[in-house]
Amino acid sequence: MEVVDETEALQRFFEGHDINGALEPSNIDTSILEEYISKEDASDLCFPDISAPASSASYSHGQPAMPGSSGVHHLSPPGGGPSPGRHGPLPPPGYGTPLNCNNNNGMGAAPKPFPGGTGPPIKAEPKAPYAPGTLPDSPPDSGSEAYSPQQVNEPHLLRTITPETLCHVGVPSRLEHPPPPPAHLPGPPPPPPPPPHYPVLQRDLYMKAEPPIPHYAAMGQGLVPTDLHHTQQSQMLHQLLQQHGAELPTHPSKKRKHSESPPSTLNAQMLNGMIKQEPGTVTALPLHPTRAPSPPWPPQGPLSPGPGSLPLSIARVQTPPWHPPGAPSPGLLQDSDSLSGSYLDPNYQSIKWQPHQQNKWATLYDANYKELPMLTYRVDADKGFNFSVGDDAFVCQKKNHFQVTVYIGMLGEPKYVKTPEGLKPLDCFYLKLHGVKLEALNQSINIEQSQSDRSKRPFNPVTVNLPPEQVTKVTVGRLHFSETTANNMRKKGKPNPDQRYFMLVVALQAHAQNQNYTLAAQISERIIVRASNPGQFESDSDVLWQRAQVPDTVFHHGRVGINTDRPDEALVVHGNVKVMGSLMHPSDLRAKEHVQEVDTTEQLKRISRMRLVHYRYKPEFAASAGIEATAPETGVIAQEVKEILPEAVKDTGDMVFANGKTIENFLVVNKERIFMENVGAVKELCKLTDNLETRIDELERWSHKLAKLRRLDSLKSTGSSGAFSHAGSQFSRAGSVPHKKRPPKVASKSSSVVPDQACISQRFLQGTIIALVVVMAFSVVSMSTLYVLSLRTEEDLVDTDGSFAVSTSCLLALLRPQPPGGSEALCPWSSQSFGTTQLRQSPLTTGLPGIQPSLLLVTTSLTSSAPGSAVRTLDMCSSHPCPVICCSSPTTNPTTGPSLGPSFNPGHVLSPSPSPSTNRSGPSQMALLPVTNIRAKSWGLSVNGIGHSKHHKSLEPLASPAVPFPGGQGKAKNSPSLGFHGRARRGALQSSVGPAEPTWAQGQSASLLAEPVPSLTSIQVLENSMSITSQYCAPGDACRPGNFTYHIPVSSGTPLHLSLTLQMNSSSPVSVVLCSLRSKEEPCEEGSLPQSLHTHQDTQGTSHRWPITILSFREFTYHFRVALLGQANCSSEALAQPATDYHFHFYRLCD
């Protein structure tokens, strides 16, 4: 231990302050000197600016030391032992956050402690001599923080100061410390302290003092902080950085320089005198309510202060892991300056920061190679930046310094940093400050720092120590920009439009293996750096409001708020605005681009979706906005409009009321945008109105035409009645007499048709009317004559299947019994005026199963017949000449019947088997007609026995035209499409050998005779508009109530598999169902026979459409049944209900 006598102590004291007679007794406090003289061992005292070299020493006990730099402040954790105990033994005095009395900030050559606590002497910094009787002036605004590597005067040290030297020259890395013991266990016992020494201490040292940490509550029994989740610590750290400190009590205190501090012992009074203190004292947060207070500190060492004194080192801020998230942490100490609510107050215009180049930020990893959460990082500009309303930017004077405070919260204990080359071990952390140009961010602006002698030197990065789970506060002061911005001069008292700006960048970087990696960085708003006095630029009367170039006008540069001090637009008014004129908006086409016409239909839809409501504003909002709360309003809701028209709604940030209530993300509506939507909607309504007017005009014209036609009909009826009741001489009288009574009517009609009545004479009109009446009378007489002639012709000729059957000319007798399978008929070949003779076979169903007579009808088509009496042939040939299809001579079937299909039921259908017969002609020209021999074979499809089924949900699609019988479909108003399919196969044919079905008339009971029988009123083939009427009925009782059989001729050129549609109409709603499809011949094509019918569905309504197909047979028959609504059934049991059967027999004309 170095022994210093009293004389040398006095010499050191006075040399350190250079007073030389300038000191007065009232300005000197010699209490510290007197205490040193009176005490035997004053090893716990620390003198400023000791000129003689001293040996290094380290404190190995658990008591924290006084911070060596005013800018780095740490708070020791409560209950967890001393702060250095978390990271092993304390580092030597050159520690980056030094725990001794020097202020070398890691830049002094302080080596590690040697064994025994001694080491080489540290060279003192030479002091600049001062003139006798004078004191050095304080630097500008001496209340600022002076935290930067202390400027060393040695040239070789100045040349070698780099971030690398900061890491290795200053302090040994804290990453090399052993892991700390658990917080709930006491730290290792402190070893005996080595002999202390007093290194060099700078004169003008300004430090910020923190109050002593109070005794906090002890941890709960058995509660281990390491077992708690890591995210709670992260939330606490983030809460610390964002903590609003408005509720903390503040007490203003006077700023004092270190040279004015009275010498005293190292207690709280002496520390408050030596250390510069910001306005407001530090207040600890209240204790946790569930903790019982107990002393958290370990046994005090030799240098530990008493219970009422202040520790020499206020350690870093630590968030207790046991503290629940969201509540104030008992381990946090906040000063009312840095964490006060002044920075959060929107009225306080402080410079804002935002992250800078986040894509270049590196990631930290712990010793287990696990990625650590992102550290919390916040930057505050405490001093030096003033907001200029005229320039709308922050202004910094180059000769005045600024100050920056950084809060860094480290989550976890980092050991490695992730680089493009992989993980690298960390050496140290440091802060780097520099400026950039707004127009060129790659151009860097150097930052300078003023010294105590008012000299400026380049600012070097600041080495910081970041313990885990703590927040470190670093304050860097007395900073200056090395240059000013360009174009600072005003033009005519207004801001220069070519003004250039700087931005300040504060970055936290990590050093690893001679490389620097950015961990976090923030960049400030635009800054104007001026070299002149701000009084030359700022003027409260000229800059804010001044006269403009136009007479009687006032100019203001910036935003204007009326009844509000936070305008976010050019003009914000809280209250009503009365405008006697108009509001103008720019609308010149020359100032617009991408002009596109809108769809007014969509605008009408959007307007129709908007909801108008009546409402009143809440009283707290009305008071803040300056409007009346009781006045009812009508308008829209912004949230609803945002869903319909997002561009009409804008977010204006948080709305704070006078009572403190806040509406986050307050929404406002652009009513001008909604007005334009209304314009488009009105245009669309105009279009609809024009269309309606056009249609109304058309309807009016049609109504006028119908009125004219009705008047003409009335005139015609009057003329025809006069023609039939009077003689020819009375026609003129009937036409002239009413003329005298109708001049106004004729005049009104002529005025509507012809504008000039003089152009048409009265005599011309009379003649025209008489001529019309005569022509009408002649037409009526002609129509009557033709009708009488047609009735007589129909009596002579009987219409059968589109041709006339001449019963008197052809012999239809000789129907004698023949063997089963054929019949014989003779027809004379006479020279009548008939065309091609056609032999057809029309079976007559009887009740006898064994004997089935056949009727051979000789039908001819007249070469010349009366108009309207000819039967139309179904001819659907699209190309001429049409090839003859399915007209080959019929083949003789084998005597044995075919095999029955699997779906065949022989008890349902019986097709007649005609008996073989011969056809003899007359004596002159008698020809034996060919006999068709069909033995017990009748091809057909039947659904007899299949009951009524409900509607199926899954309907099969229609078959392709290649299928012989595509899906049948009946169309009605309330009937779905129905279908049945099947590609014909030879083996799938169904044979009908049972007795014939009895008709409904035979099976009905007497009680049903009085009930109305459902029937069809009209039948038509839609494809060629061919109506099927009674002309297609066969002679006899083929068409009678309850059973209608139509014989429809098909031309030989009609292609096979042609799909047609039967349109069946009824006067009342009925049900129609397809019961069977039959044919008695062999098919014309192999493999073209339809399969068995599936279950059919009836169609209901008054209009029914059923698809049918021209099959590959010469003859085939469709059987439909019409019944009451919902009672259609093809089974024999359904015959007791009123029903009507319709048979459509198609046959080819192959002559």
Curated annotation (Swiss-Prot):
Domain Peptidase S74: 587-696
CDD domains, alphabetized: Peptidase_S74_CIMCD
Domain of life: Eukaryota
Region (Disordered) location: 55-150, 170-200, 284-339, 722-750, 897-925
Keyword Acetylation among UniProt keywords: yes
Tissue expression pattern: Expressed in lung, ARPE-19 cell line, brainstem, uterus and, to a lesser extent, in basal ganglion and liver. Weakly expressed in cerebellum and retina.
Segments of the chain annotated as binding DNA: 250-541
Cytoplasmic side: 1-768
Entries under SUPFAM superfamilies matching the protein: p53-like transcription factors
Motif (Nuclear localization signal): 254-257, 491-494
Biased composition (Low complexity): 67-77, 329-339
Coiled coil regions, renumbered to chain: 680-711
Keywords: Acetylation, Activator, Autocatalytic cleavage, Coiled coil, Cytoplasm, Differentiation, Disease variant, DNA-binding, Endoplasmic reticulum, Glycoprotein, Hydrolase, Membrane, Nucleus, Protease, Transcription, Transcription regulation, Transmembrane, Transmembrane helix
Annotated GO MF terms: DNA-binding transcription factor activity; DNA-binding transcription factor activity, RNA polymerase II-specific; identical protein binding; peptidase activity; sequence-specific DNA binding
An individual GO BP term: central nervous system myelination
Segments passing through the bilayer: 769-789
Effect listed in the UniProt record for changing residue 608 to A: Does not affect autocatalytic cleavage
Pfam family, one: Peptidase_S74
Its EC number(s): 3.4.-.-
UniProt key word Transport: no
Composition skew (Polar residues), residue ranges: 722-733
InterPro entries: MRF-like, MYRF_C2, MYRF_ICA, NDT80_DNA-bd_dom, NDT80_DNA-bd_dom_sf, p53-like_TF_DNA-bd_sf, S74_ICA
UniProt subunit comment: Homotrimer. Interacts (via C-terminal region) with TMEM98; the interaction inhibits MYRF self-cleavage.
Pathology noted in the entry: Encephalitis/encephalopathy, mild, with reversible myelin vacuolization: An autosomal dominant disease characterized by episodes of acute encephalitis associated with impaired consciousness, delirious behavior, seizures, and reversible splenial lesions observed on diffusion magnetic resonance imaging. Most patients completely recover and there are no neurologic sequelae. MMERV occurs in children and is frequently associated with a trigger, such as a febrile illness. Cardiac-urogenital syndrome: An autosomal dominant syndrome characterized by partial anomalous pulmonary venous return, tracheal anomalies, pulmonary hypoplasia, congenital diaphragmatic hernia, thyroid fibrosis, thymic involution, cleft spleen, penoscrotal hypospadias, and cryptorchidism.
Family to which this protein belongs: Belongs to the MRF family.
Protein name in the entry: Myelin regulatory factor
Organism encoding this protein: Homo sapiens
Taxonomy of the source species: Eukaryota, Metazoa, Chordata, Craniata, Vertebrata
Gene: MYRF
